[in-house]
Protein backbone atom coordinates (compact mmCIF):
# COMPACT_ATOMS: atom_id res chain seq x y z
CA UNK A 1 0.00 0.00 0.00
CA UNK A 2 1.13 3.46 -0.76
CA UNK A 3 0.70 6.08 1.88
CA UNK A 4 -0.31 9.47 0.77
CA UNK A 5 1.72 12.40 1.88
CA UNK A 6 -1.37 14.64 2.24
CA UNK A 7 -2.87 15.05 5.73
CA UNK A 8 -6.55 15.86 6.50
CA UNK A 9 -7.27 19.21 8.19
CA UNK A 10 -7.88 19.11 11.92
CA UNK A 11 -11.35 20.03 13.36
CA UNK A 12 -11.25 22.84 15.87
CA UNK A 13 -12.94 22.64 19.25
CA UNK A 14 -15.11 25.71 18.63
CA UNK A 15 -16.63 24.08 15.60
CA UNK A 16 -17.45 21.02 17.64
CA UNK A 17 -19.16 23.14 20.32
CA UNK A 18 -21.30 24.90 17.77
CA UNK A 19 -22.40 21.62 16.33
CA UNK A 20 -23.33 20.33 19.78
CA UNK A 21 -25.42 23.42 20.46
CA UNK A 22 -27.27 23.01 17.18
CA UNK A 23 -28.06 19.41 17.94
CA UNK A 24 -29.36 20.21 21.40
CA UNK A 25 -31.63 22.89 19.98
CA UNK A 26 -33.75 20.54 17.98
CA UNK A 27 -36.46 18.64 19.88
CA UNK A 28 -37.28 15.86 17.42
CA UNK A 29 -34.02 14.00 16.87
CA UNK A 30 -30.41 14.46 17.64
CA UNK A 31 -27.76 13.21 15.29
CA UNK A 32 -24.09 13.51 15.74
CA UNK A 33 -21.44 12.73 13.14
CA UNK A 34 -17.91 12.86 14.23
CA UNK A 35 -14.90 11.83 12.32
CA UNK A 36 -11.63 11.52 13.92
CA UNK A 37 -8.52 10.85 11.98
CA UNK A 38 -5.35 10.41 13.79
CA UNK A 39 -2.39 9.54 11.73
CA UNK A 40 1.25 10.03 12.51
CA UNK A 41 3.25 11.54 9.62
CA UNK A 42 2.84 8.95 6.83
CA UNK A 43 -0.17 7.04 8.04
CA UNK A 44 -3.63 7.18 6.34
CA UNK A 45 -6.73 8.40 7.99
CA UNK A 46 -9.54 6.28 9.31
CA UNK A 47 -13.08 7.50 9.77
CA UNK A 48 -15.19 6.35 12.60
CA UNK A 49 -18.91 6.65 12.37
CA UNK A 50 -21.26 6.58 15.32
CA UNK A 51 -24.72 5.16 15.09
CA UNK A 52 -27.68 7.54 15.44
CA UNK A 53 -29.37 7.10 18.84
CA UNK A 54 -32.79 8.48 19.65
CA UNK A 55 -32.66 10.29 22.98
CA UNK A 56 -35.87 10.66 25.01
CA UNK A 57 -36.43 14.18 26.30
CA UNK A 58 -37.22 14.23 29.95
CA UNK A 59 -40.12 16.57 30.94
CA UNK A 60 -39.14 19.04 33.57
CA UNK A 61 -41.57 19.85 36.40
CA UNK A 62 -41.93 23.52 35.57
CA UNK A 63 -45.76 23.67 35.65
CA UNK A 64 -46.19 23.22 39.41
CA UNK A 65 -45.04 26.67 40.51
CA UNK A 66 -47.09 28.26 37.72
CA UNK A 67 -50.19 26.40 38.84
CA UNK A 68 -49.52 27.39 42.42
CA UNK A 69 -49.23 31.00 41.33
CA UNK A 70 -52.54 30.78 39.50
CA UNK A 71 -54.22 29.37 42.58
CA UNK A 72 -52.80 32.15 44.73
CA UNK A 73 -54.07 34.83 42.32
CA UNK A 74 -57.56 33.31 42.29
CA UNK A 75 -57.70 33.25 46.05
CA UNK A 76 -56.52 36.85 46.19
CA UNK A 77 -59.25 37.90 43.75
CA UNK A 78 -61.90 36.15 45.82
CA UNK A 79 -60.71 37.88 48.97
CA UNK A 80 -60.79 41.25 47.22
CA UNK A 81 -64.35 40.63 45.98
CA UNK A 82 -65.61 39.66 49.43
CA UNK A 83 -63.95 42.70 51.00
CA UNK A 84 -65.61 45.00 48.44
CA UNK A 85 -69.01 43.43 49.10
CA UNK A 86 -68.67 43.93 52.84
CA UNK A 87 -67.57 47.53 52.38
CA UNK A 88 -70.51 48.35 50.09
CA UNK A 89 -72.97 46.75 52.51
CA UNK A 90 -71.61 48.76 55.44
CA UNK A 91 -71.80 52.00 53.44
CA UNK A 92 -75.45 51.35 52.55
CA UNK A 93 -76.34 50.75 56.18
CA UNK A 94 -74.55 53.93 57.20
CA UNK A 95 -76.53 56.00 54.68
CA UNK A 96 -79.85 54.49 55.75
CA UNK A 97 -79.41 54.68 59.55
CA UNK A 98 -77.89 57.93 60.92
CA UNK A 99 -75.23 57.50 63.58
CA UNK A 100 -76.51 57.91 67.17
CA UNK A 101 -75.69 61.21 68.81
CA UNK A 102 -73.34 60.99 71.77
CA UNK A 103 -75.00 61.73 75.13
CA UNK A 104 -74.25 65.14 76.62
CA UNK A 105 -71.63 65.19 79.34
CA UNK A 106 -73.08 65.23 82.86
CA UNK A 107 -73.03 68.65 84.43
CA UNK A 108 -71.21 68.79 87.78
CA UNK A 109 -73.42 69.62 90.72
CA UNK A 110 -72.97 72.75 92.81
CA UNK A 111 -70.80 74.35 90.16
CA UNK A 112 -72.73 77.61 89.85
CA UNK A 113 -73.45 79.41 93.08
CA UNK A 114 -76.74 81.33 93.38
CA UNK A 115 -76.52 85.04 92.65
CA UNK A 116 -75.84 87.23 95.66
CA UNK A 117 -78.81 89.08 97.16
CA UNK A 118 -79.24 92.68 96.07
CA UNK A 119 -77.66 95.26 98.35
CA UNK A 120 -79.94 97.18 100.71
CA UNK A 121 -81.06 100.58 99.46
CA UNK A 122 -78.99 103.52 100.54
CA UNK A 123 -81.12 105.71 102.85
CA UNK A 124 -78.98 108.76 102.01
CA UNK A 125 -79.39 108.51 98.25
CA UNK A 126 -81.75 110.94 96.57
CA UNK A 127 -83.01 108.19 94.26
CA UNK A 128 -84.59 106.25 97.11
CA UNK A 129 -88.37 106.40 96.57
CA UNK A 130 -89.11 106.07 100.30
CA UNK A 131 -87.51 109.48 100.95
CA UNK A 132 -90.29 111.56 99.47
CA UNK A 133 -89.50 114.88 101.13
CA UNK A 134 -90.81 118.00 99.45
CA UNK A 135 -89.08 121.36 99.85
CA UNK A 136 -90.84 124.71 99.47
CA UNK A 137 -90.33 126.75 96.34
CA UNK A 138 -89.40 129.88 98.33
CA UNK A 139 -86.51 129.88 100.83
CA UNK A 140 -87.22 130.19 104.53
CA UNK A 141 -85.14 133.31 104.87
CA UNK A 142 -84.83 135.03 108.24
CA UNK A 143 -88.43 134.37 109.18
CA UNK A 144 -87.85 130.64 109.93
CA UNK A 145 -91.57 130.03 110.01
CA UNK A 146 -91.89 126.21 110.03
CA UNK A 147 -95.65 126.41 110.33
CA UNK A 148 -95.90 127.64 106.72
CA UNK A 149 -93.56 124.82 105.66
CA UNK A 150 -95.90 122.28 107.31
CA UNK A 151 -98.86 123.80 105.46
CA UNK A 152 -96.92 123.46 102.23
CA UNK A 153 -96.38 119.73 102.88
CA UNK A 154 -100.09 119.23 103.51
CA UNK A 155 -101.11 121.02 100.30
CA UNK A 156 -98.44 119.38 98.14
CA UNK A 157 -99.26 115.86 99.38
CA UNK A 158 -102.34 115.87 97.15
CA UNK A 159 -100.23 116.49 94.04
CA UNK A 160 -97.74 113.73 94.92
CA UNK A 161 -100.42 111.03 95.30
CA UNK A 162 -99.83 109.85 91.72
CA UNK A 163 -96.06 109.44 92.25
CA UNK A 164 -96.61 107.44 95.46
CA UNK A 165 -98.37 104.67 93.48
CA UNK A 166 -94.99 103.30 92.31
CA UNK A 167 -93.95 102.69 95.95
CA UNK A 168 -97.03 100.71 96.92
CA UNK A 169 -95.06 97.91 98.58
CA UNK A 170 -93.24 100.19 101.04
CA UNK A 171 -96.20 102.48 101.70
CA UNK A 172 -98.58 99.59 102.35
CA UNK A 173 -96.42 98.45 105.27
CA UNK A 174 -96.25 102.00 106.67
CA UNK A 175 -99.93 102.90 106.16
CA UNK A 176 -102.01 99.75 106.71
CA UNK A 177 -105.16 101.71 107.53
CA UNK A 178 -105.61 103.37 104.10
CA UNK A 179 -104.16 101.09 101.41
CA UNK A 180 -106.31 102.52 98.63
CA UNK A 181 -104.63 105.92 98.87
CA UNK A 182 -101.06 104.78 98.18
CA UNK A 183 -101.74 101.74 96.00
CA UNK A 184 -101.91 101.78 92.20
CA UNK A 185 -104.93 103.75 90.90
CA UNK A 186 -107.92 101.54 90.22
CA UNK A 187 -111.42 102.51 89.18
CA UNK A 188 -113.91 102.84 92.09
CA UNK A 189 -116.95 100.53 92.31
CA UNK A 190 -119.21 103.30 91.01
CA UNK A 191 -116.99 103.60 87.94
CA UNK A 192 -117.20 99.86 87.19
CA UNK A 193 -120.97 99.78 87.51
CA UNK A 194 -121.28 102.83 85.32
CA UNK A 195 -119.10 101.35 82.63
CA UNK A 196 -120.91 97.99 82.71
CA UNK A 197 -124.35 99.60 82.52
CA UNK A 198 -123.83 102.62 80.31
CA UNK A 199 -121.08 101.39 77.94
CA UNK A 200 -122.16 102.31 74.40
CA UNK A 201 -121.60 99.96 71.49
CA UNK A 202 -118.62 101.15 69.48
CA UNK A 203 -119.00 101.09 65.69
CA UNK A 204 -117.10 98.36 63.85
CA UNK A 205 -114.24 99.95 61.87
CA UNK A 206 -110.50 99.65 61.45
CA UNK A 207 -108.18 99.11 64.42
CA UNK A 208 -106.81 102.66 64.33
CA UNK A 209 -110.25 104.30 64.45
CA UNK A 210 -111.35 101.94 67.23
CA UNK A 211 -108.34 102.89 69.32
CA UNK A 212 -108.99 106.63 68.87
CA UNK A 213 -112.68 106.34 69.72
CA UNK A 214 -112.12 104.14 72.74
CA UNK A 215 -109.38 106.39 74.13
CA UNK A 216 -111.59 109.48 73.79
CA UNK A 217 -114.55 107.70 75.37
CA UNK A 218 -112.46 106.42 78.31
CA UNK A 219 -110.94 109.87 78.93
CA UNK A 220 -114.38 111.52 79.10
CA UNK A 221 -115.69 108.80 81.38
CA UNK A 222 -112.70 109.11 83.68
CA UNK A 223 -113.15 112.86 83.97
CA UNK A 224 -116.83 112.47 84.83
CA UNK A 225 -116.37 109.76 87.44
CA UNK A 226 -113.07 110.73 89.10
CA UNK A 227 -113.65 114.50 89.61
CA UNK A 228 -116.33 114.15 92.37
CA UNK A 229 -114.04 111.85 94.36
CA UNK A 230 -110.92 114.04 94.38
CA UNK A 231 -111.93 116.09 97.43
CA UNK A 232 -112.57 113.22 99.89
CA UNK A 233 -109.31 111.53 98.85
CA UNK A 234 -107.32 114.71 99.51
CA UNK A 235 -108.91 115.05 102.95
CA UNK A 236 -107.94 111.47 103.82
CA UNK A 237 -104.37 112.08 102.67
CA UNK A 238 -104.10 115.14 104.91
CA UNK A 239 -105.36 113.17 107.91
CA UNK A 240 -102.86 110.37 107.31
CA UNK A 241 -100.00 112.82 106.88
CA UNK A 242 -100.90 114.45 110.21
CA UNK A 243 -101.03 111.08 111.97
CA UNK A 244 -97.76 109.70 110.64
CA UNK A 245 -95.67 112.85 110.20
CA UNK A 246 -96.36 115.21 113.15
CA UNK A 247 -96.03 118.89 112.65
CA UNK A 248 -92.66 120.50 113.08
CA UNK A 249 -94.13 122.94 115.58
CA UNK A 250 -95.09 120.04 117.88
CA UNK A 251 -91.74 118.26 117.64
CA UNK A 252 -89.46 121.28 117.81
CA UNK A 253 -90.33 123.96 120.35
CA UNK A 254 -89.27 127.39 119.16
CA UNK A 255 -89.51 130.64 121.08
CA UNK A 256 -92.46 132.87 120.44
CA UNK A 257 -90.43 135.53 118.67
CA UNK A 258 -89.51 133.03 115.88
CA UNK A 259 -93.16 132.35 115.08
CA UNK A 260 -93.96 136.03 114.54
CA UNK A 261 -94.42 137.57 111.13
CA UNK A 262 -91.77 139.57 109.33
CA UNK A 263 -93.28 142.96 110.22
CA UNK A 264 -93.46 142.13 113.92
CA UNK A 265 -90.04 140.46 113.92
CA UNK A 266 -88.06 143.26 112.33
CA UNK A 267 -89.86 146.14 114.08
CA UNK A 268 -87.27 148.13 116.07
CA UNK A 269 -89.42 148.37 119.19
CA UNK A 270 -90.05 144.69 119.18
CA UNK A 271 -86.33 143.94 118.99
CA UNK A 272 -85.51 146.26 121.90
CA UNK A 273 -88.38 144.91 124.00
CA UNK A 274 -87.38 141.31 123.39
CA UNK A 275 -83.72 141.77 124.18
CA UNK A 276 -84.52 143.96 127.19
CA UNK A 277 -86.82 141.28 128.63
CA UNK A 278 -84.00 138.74 128.94
CA UNK A 279 -81.35 139.51 131.61
CA UNK A 280 -78.50 138.03 129.58
CA UNK A 281 -79.12 140.07 126.41
CA UNK A 282 -79.30 143.81 127.31
CA UNK A 283 -80.38 146.21 124.53
CA UNK A 284 -77.62 147.82 122.50
CA UNK A 285 -77.14 151.57 122.75
CA UNK A 286 -77.71 153.54 119.56
CA UNK A 287 -74.99 155.89 118.34
CA UNK A 288 -75.22 158.72 115.90
CA UNK A 289 -73.08 158.89 112.75
CA UNK A 290 -71.33 162.04 113.94
CA UNK A 291 -70.23 160.40 117.15
CA UNK A 292 -68.77 157.43 115.25
CA UNK A 293 -66.77 159.70 112.90
CA UNK A 294 -65.32 161.70 115.81
CA UNK A 295 -64.02 158.65 117.69
CA UNK A 296 -60.45 157.46 117.36
CA UNK A 297 -59.29 153.89 116.99
CA UNK A 298 -58.35 153.55 120.64
CA UNK A 299 -61.67 154.90 121.84
CA UNK A 300 -63.52 152.62 119.47
CA UNK A 301 -61.76 149.52 120.74
CA UNK A 302 -62.20 150.62 124.35
UniProtKB/Swiss-Prot annotation:
Its main location: nucleus. GO terms for cellular component: nucleus. Disruption phenotype: High tolerance to several reactive oxygen species (ROS)-inducing agents such as paraquat (PQ), aminotriazole (AT), and the fungal Alternaria alternata f.sp. lycopersici toxin (AAL toxin); these phenotypes are probably due to higher basal levels of ROS and constant transcription of abiotic- and oxidative stress-related genes. Reduced sensitivity to drought stress. Transmembrane segments: none annotated. GO terms for biological process: regulation of response to oxidative stress; response to cadmium ion; response to hydrogen peroxide; response to mannitol; response to molecule of fungal origin; response to osmotic stress; response to oxidative stress; response to paraquat. Residues 97-123 have a biased composition (Pro residues). This is Protein AAL-toxin resistant 7. PANTHER family: E1A-BINDING PROTEIN P400-LIKE, MYB-LIKE PROTEIN A. Required to regulate responses to abiotic stress (drought) and to oxidative stress leading to cell death. Confers sensitivity to paraquat (PQ), to the catalase inhibitor aminotriazole (AT), and to the fungal Alternaria alternata f.sp. lycopersici toxin (AAL toxin). Residues 155-173, 191-200 have a biased composition (Low complexity). Residues 201-210 have a biased composition (Polar residues). It comes from Arabidopsis thaliana (Mouse-ear cress). Residues 32-65, 86-125, 155-210 are annotated as: Disordered. Keywords: Nucleus, Stress response. Residues 51-62 have a biased composition (Basic residues). It comes from the Eukaryota. It is found in: Nucleus. Induction: Induced by oxidative and abiotic stresses such as hydrogen peroxide H(2)O(2), cadmium chlorure CdCl(2), and osmotic stress induced by mannitol or salt. Seems not activated by heat and cold.
Amino acid sequence: MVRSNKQEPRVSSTYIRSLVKQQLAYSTTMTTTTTTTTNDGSGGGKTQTQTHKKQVRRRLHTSRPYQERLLNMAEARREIVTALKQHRASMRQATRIPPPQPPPPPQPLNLFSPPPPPPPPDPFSWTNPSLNFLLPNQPLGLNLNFQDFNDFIQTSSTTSSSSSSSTSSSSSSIFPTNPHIYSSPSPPPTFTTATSDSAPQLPSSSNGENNVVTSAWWSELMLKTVEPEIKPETEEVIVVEDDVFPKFSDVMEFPSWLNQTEEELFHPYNLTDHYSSSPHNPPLSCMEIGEIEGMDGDDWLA
